[in-house]
UniProtKB/Swiss-Prot annotation:
Subunit structure and binding partners: Component of the N-terminal acetyltransferase B (NatB) complex which is composed of NAA20 and NAA25.
Single GO BP term: cytoskeleton organization
Statement: the UniProt record of this protein carries the keyword Methyltransferase: no
Protein name per UniProt: N-alpha-acetyltransferase 25, NatB auxiliary subunit
Family matches, as Gene3D superfamilies: 1.25.40.1040
Function: Non-catalytic subunit of the NatB complex which catalyzes acetylation of the N-terminal methionine residues of peptides beginning with Met-Asp, Met-Glu, Met-Asn and Met-Gln. May play a role in normal cell-cycle progression.
Disulfide bridge partners, by residue number: none
TPR repeat coordinates: 11-44, 45-78, 79-112, 114-146
Similarity section: Belongs to the MDM20/NAA25 family.
Gene Ontology cellular component annotations, sorted alphabetically: cytoplasm; NatB complex
A molecular function GO annotation: acetyltransferase activator activity
Keywords assigned by UniProt, alphabetized: Cytoplasm, Repeat, TPR repeat
Localization of this protein: Cytoplasm
């Protein structure tokens, strides 16, 4: 704001100190300076706005808004006031007010290019595409520059993209945009590459692929110069759309002759060759094969072409990988066609061996060969690995010393072999003792490799880090398959040690986060996740690793913090993408604008966003709303309406990165598309249950007095259902969602450890909390019915309520029984974690909170009836008036409820005392059968202290249990 050029206006000189104060964050001084200036110059509008900015930044939003509107009502046209108001409205998150500001300015100064331009950008921020189109044309009429004209054209395209009616898009908006561009083409007014890109975009969206191809191949296509091969790539895309496989083949062949290392064109070349074979295409007897030149239409041609590229590469000083990998890809495709024997390109095993000899010292060698290992017969895998090891330069092994590499090149080669060994499943077929031997060897190689990285910076990874990761993966195998928790403690120790040598290794941190969470130890996770320094979209793609466990492990403060991190990103998404769109208009990057819109929609419809939003509101209610009054206030402050569902169920997008962990597992053990599909299904079911629970809770305060007249018809006013009907409908939907979820859980789906994280749904059902919560909401419905009908003649309803109260109390006792047990069990020096106990306890606390809100509602209904009966007794002095048994039943229920809560608090205190009494340093974490090397004691102690320390946070649950118990005595 303070970056202001040379000015002649004396007002600018007067305003400069205020700008400086605001830029330096000294908002109070800015307000004082503005007040001084306004005493002398009352009509200096900009000073008022700058004062409003200071007020806004000091939390005095209402004063700031009032002051800003005073100035806006005057419809200022000076640049300083307009810019200051724009900044203020942005900080207020009111971009729609900026449009009104510049609409007024444009009316007063109709020929101002600057104001028209600002108006266009203001419309862009709020997505007013129709008005953007009009503003763009108005700007072009004032200043006939091409960019302004094409702003209007692009706004038409945006109208077509946002139109719900696809037919309207293709019959009105896009044809109009096409005619506008064609007018400029005919008048020979196309000047910039961006304008050609826009024309191409319109034709492509209209499905006019041939016309788009003609544009790219014609004179206009010559303007496409900013990106390498931009013209060729667009031609290729159109050839594919038009199924012009001869041209597709010839163009990809020609591009490969220029650059034989471009992998994307190998794939296109192979696709086109086999398409032509399928169609039995033959070249014409005379003339060119196609518009792009010679065409290869047989397998023989493809084989010869690849062999020629390899020969050419061997004669070049530059080592290229493309031709060698293309040969393996061709073998795969020929084999799938059943004609590999006819065209002998060589044995895949030998080809991969030769490839390893050429590129084995490159980190990319493993990822290159990973794609083709399925060409190897299972019986040859061990032989293949031994063959690779035979060419790795290692020292001579002795009885007490491994064969080790002498340099980084040798280390990379050996590391590639080890990765391939795991990928081929050779480690998985070993027994436990063999796996432990592998772990020992890998860790010795890891420590030896550290010698090569002594000069590495803290931000760099050690060359041997993958050895440590692979050792951890093998230990995880032992843990998951044999159930030996000692192995996972050892894995934690190795990861902690690895992190001291490679503080920036994200894989170490991610694995630590995953394992600590599974063990139920959340305290170290927060710092580990923070150290990952997740940026922007990563809050959506990997945030689930943190938010899934925070609340479920009783870490309420951390859960609130992690939700805030994620929500801050999602809420800023709308503002950020608007700025990206504006920049794209300014610089003519029109093809990026639909991408930005799609990106924004993808984030707005994010599954993780919906989950975090729902869990955060539930968490806030549980932490803040202790009694029904504050529950009503909390729900009001959150603007929660039970009848409104804000989750875009039909458009939910799963943006989680489920491949974030490095994995060297064979295909049958790795994360599959089926796993991802099932995980999304499970996450959606759980979100539906949580969303309905939240809406049911938000419906409770609306049921309190005044109630509908006795025996009244349940009617709808203005199409809005009565409050209890909303609750009953939501309860019905919840029961359906629960049944669907139970059927899913019965499948007992097991995800890979490094794959999707299971939801809390299974524990929710098995703990009995689900049944308890549903039962409590049914109780609300019955009590509401009693309230509307009165005590007289409702014996059946009263008996139903009495039975519900008794069964609800029994259900709660059953839930509490699942919370009993120690969080850590120590036996023979070994420790075993019981995170299920903690998760059950957290669900129990949540259920208790819901039950207490329901009980509070019941009390609010029953109390007036009891008082009324007591008044009648006193007034008539009659002893014949009998108190209905429902009051006694409710009182017994409340007494029992308080006993359950008291027992729960005592249990939590007992858990804490048990944890503190543990002498953690005496735990034997270095099982001699697993310990591969003499690890530093500090790493072992770090894990010893870090994990149990997490459970001490359980104290946060205890006051919550006690505080949410309102006085519900009647």
């Amino acid at each position: 704001m303070a970056t202001r050029g040379h000015v002649q206006d004396p007002n600018d000189r007067r305003l400069r100190p205020i700008y400086d104060y605001l830029d330096n964050g000294n908002n109070k001084m800015a307000i004082q300076q503005a007040d001084k200036l306004l005493k002398k110059h009352r009509d200096l509008h900009c000073a008022k706005v700058l004062k409003a900015i200071g007020l806004q930044r000091t939390g005095r939003q209402e004063e700031a808004f009032t002051l800003a509107q005073e100035v806006a009502a005057l419809e200022p046209t000076d640049d300083n006031s307009l810019q200051a108001l724009t900044i203020l409205y942005r900080e207020m998150h009111r971009p729609e007010l900026v449009t009104k500001l510049y609409e007024a300015a444009v009316k007063k100064v109709p020929n101002s290019e600057e104001y028209h331009s600002h108006l266009f950008m203001a419309y862009a921020r709020v997505g007013e595409y129709k008005k953007m189109q009009q503003a763009g044309m108005a700007l072009y009429k004032i200043v006939p520059k091409n960019p302004y004209y094409f702003w209007s054209v692009m706004s038409l395209i945006m109208q077509s993209i946002s139109a719900r009616d696809e037919n309207l898009s293709k019959t009105m908006f896009l044809p109009l945009a096409e005619r506008m561009v064609e007018k400029m083409v005919k008048e020979d007014k196309i000047e910039a590459e961006a304008e050609v890109e826009l024309y191409y975009m319109i034709l492509e969206r209209l499905g006019k692929y041939q016309e788009a191809l003609d544009v790219i191949r014609g004179k206009l296509g010559e303007k496409l110069t900013s990106e390498i091969q931009s013209r060729e790539n667009k031609c290729m895309a159109m050839y594919k759309k038009l199924s012009k496989w001869p041209e597709c083949n010839a163009l990809s062949r020609r591009l490969l002759l220029k650059n034989s290392d471009d992998w994307q064109f190998y794939l296109t070349y192979f696709d086109s060759v086999f398409r032509l074979i399928e169609e039995a295409w033959t070249p014409p007897a005379e003339g060119e094969h196609s518009l792009e030149g010679e065409v290869h239409c047989s397998a023989e041609d493809a084989v010869k072409f690849i062999e020629d590229r390899i020969t050419e590469a061997s004669q070049s000083s530059r080592h290229v990988r493309g031709p060698h990998l293309a040969k393996l890809e061709l073998i795969r495709r020929l084999r799938s066609q059943g004609c590999n024997d006819e065209f002998r390109l060589g044995d895949p095993e030998e080809l991969m061996f030769q490839y390893f000899k050429k590129f084995g010292d490159k980190p990319c060698c493993f990822t290159d060969l990973k794609v083709f290992v399925d060409l190897l017969p299972a019986a040859q895998c061990t032989q293949f690995i031994n063959q690779l090891l035979g060419v790795v330069p290692l020292s001579t092994p002795t009885e007490d010393k491994l064969a080790l590499p002498a340099d980084i090149r040798g280390l990379q080669q050996h590391l590639c072999v080890v990765q391939l060994t795991r990928l081929l499943g050779l480690y998985h077929s070993m027994d436990k003792n063999q796996k432990l031997d592998v772990v020992r060897e890998l860790m010795l190689r890891y420590q030896h490799g550290l010698e090569f990285g002594r000069s590495c910076l803290k931000t760099e990874l050690q060359f041997s880090d993958y050895y440590c990761l692979l050792a951890v993966h093998v230990l995880i195998d032992i843990w998951r398959e044999a159930g030996e928790e000692t192995a996972v403690w050892q894995a934690l120790t190795l990861l902690e040690e690895g992190l001291t040598h490679s503080p920036s290794n994200a894989q170490f941190k991610l694995l630590l986060v995953r394992i600590y969470c599974v063990l139920g130890a959340f305290e170290p996770v927060v710092d580990l996740y923070s150290s990952l320094d997740a940026k922007h979209i990563q809050h959506d793609t990997i945030g689930y690793l943190l938010t899934r466990y925070a609340a479920s492990l009783g870490q309420y403060a951390a859960a609130s913090q992690s939700c805030n991190f994620a929500l801050r990103f999602f809420h800023s998404n709308q503002k950020d993408t608007s700025e990206y769109i504006i920049q794209a208009y300014k610089y003519g990057a029109f093809e990026k604008i639909p991408e930005f819109i799609a990106f924004r929609n993808r984030l707005n419809n994010s599954l993780h966003f919906a989950q975090v939003r729902t869990e955060r509101m539930l968490l806030d209610l549980l932490l803040e709303a202790n009694i029904s009054t504050s529950l009503a206030e909390s729900i009001k402050s959150m603007n929660l309406r039970p009848e409104e569902d804000d989750v875009p169920w039909e458009d939910l997008r799963d943006n989680r990165d489920l491949d974030v962990f490095f994995s060297w597992d064979p295909k049958d053990r790795n994360v599959s598309e089926e796993h991802k599909k099932l995980s999304l299904e499970e996450e959606t079911m759980w979100l539906r249950i949580r969303s309905l629970t939240l809406r049911l809770i938000s419906a409770l305060p609306s049921l309190t007095h005044p109630v509908e007249p006795r025996n009244s018809e349940k009617t709808s006013e203005n199409g809005v259902s009565s409050r209890v009907d909303v609750l009953r409908l939501l309860l019905q939907q919840l029961e359906v969602a629960v049944e669907t979820g139970k059927r899913f859980i019965e499948k007992e789906i097991q995800y890979p450890f490094l794959g999707p994280v299971p939801t809390r749904m299974g524990r929710f059902f098995s703990s009995g909390c689900c049944q308890c919560q549903v039962h409590s909401f049914h109780l609300v419905s019955d009590v509401y019915e009693l309230d509307t009908s009165g005590l007289e003649g409702t014996v059946d309803i009263q008996e139903r309520i009495e039975n519900s109260l008794a069964s609800l109390l029994e259900l709660l006792k059953g839930v509490f029984s699942t919370c009993k047990g120690d969080l850590l069990e120590v036996k023979d020096g070994n420790v075993k974690t019981q995170p299920a106990v903690l998760e059950n306890l957290v669900f129990f606390v949540e259920t208790i909170s819901i039950v207490l809100w329901v009980s509070s509602y019941c009390e609010s209904v029953l109390r007036p009836y009891k008082l009324n009966i007591q008044k009648k007794k006193k007034k008539k002095k009659e002893t014949s008036i009998v108190m209905p048994p429902i009051f006694t039943s409710f009182q017994d229920y409340v007494t029992g409820l308080q006993t359950v809560i008291s027992n729960a608090v005592d249990h939590i205190k007992g858990l804490e005392a048990h944890l503190i009494a543990l002498k953690l340093e005496e735990l034997t974490l270095e099982d001699t059968s697993i310990s591969p090397v003499n690890l530093s004691n500090c790493h072992v102690l770090s894990v010893r202290r870090r994990d149990p320390g997490s459970y001490w946070k359980l104290g946060a649950v205890e006051p919550m249990c006690a505080d949410v118990c309102p006085s519900v005595q009647i």
